[in-house]
Swiss-Prot record:
Protein name: Bifunctional riboflavin kinase/FMN adenylyltransferase
Annotated organism of origin: Pseudomonas fluorescens
Keyword Glycoprotein annotated: no
Family under the similarity heading: Belongs to the RibF family.
UniProt function note: Catalyzes the phosphorylation of riboflavin to FMN followed by the adenylation of FMN to FAD.
Disulfide topology: none
Keyword Iron-sulfur: no
Biological process annotations from GO: FAD biosynthetic process; FMN biosynthetic process; riboflavin biosynthetic process
Record SUPFAM superfamilies: Nucleotidylyl transferase, Riboflavin kinase-like
Pathway assigned in UniProt: Cofactor biosynthesis; FAD biosynthesis; FAD from FMN: step 1/1; Cofactor biosynthesis; FMN biosynthesis; FMN from riboflavin (ATP route): step 1/1
InterPro entries, alphabetized: FAD_synthase, Riboflavin_kinase, Riboflavin_kinase_bac, Riboflavin_kinase_bac/euk, Riboflavin_kinase_dom_sf, Rossmann-like_a/b/a_fold
Gene that specifies this protein: ribF
Length: 311
């Protein structure tokens, strides 16, 4: 899978493709259905498949303080590579891009930039300044510009429309079984381990500080997790939140303690898979009270993880 950042990095060899456009936040089963159809059309036409995404996502640009928590960063839409996509075009969503009319978007990005032969979109897709572009607009543009358009049907699960919002709702309710069914895989967060204050080590429970490059996260609290490291899975306990007892920066942090693990994790990339919520994050009156709570969390995680430890 090739990642292209910005229209200015498109080359002549990138022209001629089938494409889809969207946030693809989390690449849930609805997205997967679109990508599966995209692959089919790519094979039929004998051209590469391309996913067009935006960073930041439009709602983060317009209302950053109230935009929903991201399930994954745009660069992690490289998950699409696991869905058989040949190329991801990541466009910076800025004032210039948001000002493009629907017609300009089609001309500059789809036709001049990508040379689109076929476009696959969701049934509720809108684009262009003030979101005036829709499926009907694309169909008319396709007739004039020489590309076809198809709208993917809504994917439902037990009568529920599969969407990123529904995934976030499931995560907020700590319903990881439902989240997994909506996503088609367990919910996970991947990131690199950074050096921290080493306070947890002083409290007797060393943790890996996993980098979170996002304003908001869809989870908060203490969780039973498993951590994938070089193909091996380790059970653990994770805290995700603002660390109210020891930090005052208001930023989200992900700290993971691996059960019975001995080794250096700094600068390594971990994938944290969430299984069960143990408790809410809370502010403690003292570090000693925090230590007691952490020990209880570890004991609870150990008891729950015992049947499947160290897979």
């Amino acid at each position: 899978m090739q990642l292209v950042r910005g229209l200015h990095n498109l080359r002549p060899e990138h022209r001629g493709c089938v494409a889809t456009i969207g946030n693809f936040d989390g690449v849930h089963r609805g997205h997967q259905a679109i990508l599966a159809r995209l692959r089919e059309r790519a094979v039929e036409l004998g051209v590469p498949s391309c996913v067009v995404i935006f960073e930041p996502q439009p709602r983060e640009f317009f209302t950053p303080e109230t935009a929903p928590a991201r399930l994954a960063l745009a660069r992690q839409a490289a998950t699409a590579g696991g869905e058989g996509v040949d190329r991801v075009l990541c466009l910076a969503f800025n004032q210039r891009l948001r000002s493009l009319s629907a017609a300009e978007f089609v001309d500059r990005i789809l036709v001049d930039g990508l040379g689109v032969q076929h476009l696959e979109v969701g049934d509720d897709f809108h684009f262009g300044c003030d979101r005036v572009g829709d499926f009907d607009f694309l169909q008319h543009a396709g007739v004039n510009q020489g590309f076809t358009v198809e709208a993917a049907q809504t994917v439902e699960l037990d009568g529920l429309r599969v969407s990123s919002t529904q995934v976030r709702n499931a995560l907020a309710a700590a319903d990881f079984d439902l989240a997994e069914r909506l996503l088609g895989r367990p919910f996970r967060i991947a990131g690199r381990v950074l050096h921290g204050q080493k306070l947890a080590r002083q409290l007797g429970t060393p943790t890996a500080n996993v980098q979170l490059k996002r304003r908001r996260v869809p989870l908060t609290g203490v969780y039973l997790v498993s951590v994938d490291i070089d193909g091996q899975s380790w059970p653990g306990v994770a805290n995700i939140g603002v660390r109210p007892t020891v930090a005052g920066d208001g930023k989200a942090h992900l700290e993971v303690h691996l059960l019975d693990f001995a080794g250096d994790l700094y600068d390594r990339r971990l994938t944290v898979v969430f299984h069960q919520k143990l408790r809410e994050e809370q502010r403690f009156a003292s570090l000693e009270a925090l230590k007691t709570a952490i020990n209880a969390d570890v004991a609870a995680a150990r008891a729950l993880a015992a049947p499947s430890a160290h897979r």
